[in-house]
UniProtKB/Swiss-Prot annotation:
This is Large ribosomal subunit protein bL31B. GO terms for cellular component: ribonucleoprotein complex; ribosome. GO terms for molecular function: structural constituent of ribosome. Keywords: Ribonucleoprotein, Ribosomal protein.
Length: 84
């Protein structure tokens, strides 16, 4: 490998799916301030909104996943308007 080409902070990080609570360990260069104990070790923690364990494409369930409240925000702005 060439020196100075690859990131120095490539390390194991725990990713936590906030929609269902599942966690998995993977290597990443992401900068985080939170840590968590996972399988007896302490790792940096990155919270994500959706992962393969909760995404409708991978689970086969067709449900509306709206963690950011985008539908509610749209309906509050434009849902009550009627054409006259």
């Amino acid at each position: 490998m060439k020196k100075g080409l690859h990131p120095e902070s490539y390390r194991p990080v725990v990713f936590k799916d906030m929609s269902n609570g599942d966690m998995f360990l993977s290597k990443s260069t992401v900068a985080t301030k939170e840590t968590i104990e996972f399988e007896g070790e302490t790792y940096p923690l990155l919270k994500i909104e959706i992962s393969n364990t909760s995404h409708p494409f991978y689970t086969g369930k067709s449900t509306l996943v709206d963690t950011a409240g985008r539908v509610d925000k749209f309906m509050s702005r434009y849902g009550d308007r009627k054409k006259k």
